[in-house]
Regions:
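Mature extracytoplasmic/periplasmic domains
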Residues: 298, 302, 307-365, 396-397
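Sec-dependent N-terminal signal peptides of Gram-positive bacterial secreted proteins and lipoproteins
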Residues: 4-28
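Bacterial lipoprotein signal-peptidase II cleavage site
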Residues: 23-36, 43-52
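Short, polar/charged alpha-helical segment
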Residues: 47, 64-73, 77-79, 83-103, ...
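Extracytoplasmic ligand-binding site segments that recognize negatively charged/polar headgroups
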Residues: 79-93, 105-121, 125-266
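Conserved C-terminal helix/tail region of periplasmic/extracytoplasmic solute-binding proteins
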Residues: 359-401
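A ligand-binding cleft/hinge motif common to bilobed small-molecule-binding domains
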Residues: 136-140, 268-287
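Periplasmic-binding protein-like
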Residues: 176, 240-245, 251-252, 284-308
């Protein structure tokens, strides 16, 4: 590119010389060539300066990315803790390995399990990056100083600053809408109507029919708790969960667990992310209906982050750049993950809108409150539903395996 600039300068000098020559010849004719106004000349010069600066910025960015790739390749290895679905996690890791020749090891864990592991490892993590899963546990990790800030180049493609931590501790890659999934055949058999809103879930006729994930292991459940606190206020939310618990059949380890129970009829109503319901419908369970709560709902930002003290720092940084690119996010829908994507050069999954989901039909979720108070709210939840801590919870209902 620098050589091209030199040629452009030479061409400009020759052009100027030819123009002066033509002007000299033209002055003997009927009309002399008019000079351009000073303002127009200044505008042209400014535009050329801007173009040159943009070229230099692009060159610098490309050079920086090339250097990062080489440094990551020199490390040669990356370990990923993934909290998205297994199919997408596996495909994303395989694609990264194919693109960069870096060996990738991965393990699928719920967000709660990841947080527990990195908290215990205290700055000496056995993995390098976290991929997928809602950001409430990520924000807990930020507050505990367990994530490494990184200013990602590809973050410029995020459609809003909402989808990243202000200090670069995590970056969003997708957005999932919280709601209900119901087995319409079972509801018909039982002579029950579909729930339309959060408070409907408290009706006595739904006793033992509802599935939800376990707040001690699943970020999805933590989001449900935060959502109710933000919509109802703290005390009313805890009373809500105390009543809701009477209708809960089981609290699953994974956030997607309840969605997998609805189709076969293991539970009749599931609380979780509606894209997980789409996965089940497209897998053959057309007896499932998706419901967006009438009074409003919230959403997850599925994220990626680097663990503080990781062993393969450059490979970890390259993973974040990769996760914020179409190479990574566009393969989600090919692997049973139908969340809305939050980068501007991604291909949105048509399946999400076909089932009536709207990424903007959500409450103004307070991420800062979630960052500061999630751990407290989870403790308050268990105090409300078990009259004690999570250790007192019935293990046959609150699954951890």
């Amino acid at each position: 590119m620098k050589q091209l600039k030199g040629k452009k300068a030479l061409a400009a000098i020759l052009t100027a010389a030819m123009t002066m020559s033509l002007m000299a010849c033209g002055s003997s004719g009927s009309a002399a060539t008019e000079e351009k106004p000073a303002e127009e000349t200044q505008e042209t010069a400014a535009a050329e300066t801007t173009d040159t600066a943009a070229e230099e910025t692009t060159e610098s960015s490309d050079s920086g990315m090339d250097a990062l790739i080489e440094e990551a390749k020199a490390e040669g290895k990356l370990t990923v803790y993934g909290s998205c679905e297994e199919a997408y996690l596996s495909a994303a890791c395989q694609k990264f390995e194919e693109m960069y020749g870096i060996q990738v090891d991965y393990q699928r864990l719920s967000t709660g399990e990841v947080y527990t592991k990195i908290e215990e490892e205290a700055g000496n993590p056995s993995a390098d990056v976290w991929f997928g899963g809602t950001t409430d546990p990520y924000n807990e990790a930020v507050a505990a100083g367990l994530l490494e800030p990184y200013q990602a180049q590809n973050a410029s493609h995020l459609i809003s600053d909402t989808y990243k931590d202000p200090d670069g501790n995590w970056y969003g890659i997708y957005k999932g809408i919280l709601g209900f999934m119901v087995n319409k055949e079972e509801l018909d058999r039982l002579g029950l109507e579909e729930p339309k809103d959060w408070d409907d879930l408290l009706k006595p006729e739904y006793k033992g029919l509802i599935g939800m994930s376990n707040p001690s292991t699943a970020g999805t459940a933590k989001l449900v708790i935060n959502t109710m606190v933000q919509m109802k206020g703290h005390d009313e939310a805890m009373e809500y969960f105390k009543e809701l618990d009477k209708n809960i059949y089981q609290y699953t380890k994974s956030g997607s667990g309840p969605s997998k129970m609805v189709g076969p009829g293991e539970c009749v109503i599931a609380i979780g992310f509606l894209h997980d319901g789409i996965t089940q419908i497209l897998s053959g369970y057309d007896n499932i209906d998706l419901i967006i709560p009438a009074s409003g709902t919230s959403y997850e930002i599925g994220a990626t982050a680097i663990f503080k003290g990781c062993k393969n720092e450059n490979a970890a940084k390259l993973w974040v750049e990769y996760a914020l690119s179409p190479d990574c996010v566009n393969i989600a829908k090919e692997n049973e993950s139908y969340q809305f994507l939050v980068i501007d050069n991604a291909e949105q999954p048509e399946e999400a809108t076909q089932f009536g989901l709207d990424p903007d039909n959500v409450i103004d979720y307070d991420f800062e409150d979630a960052k500061q108070n999630t751990a407290t709210y989870v403790e308050d939840f268990f105090n409300a539903v078990t009259n004690g801590s999570s250790e007192n919870a019935d293990s046959s209902r609150f699954l951890t395996e």
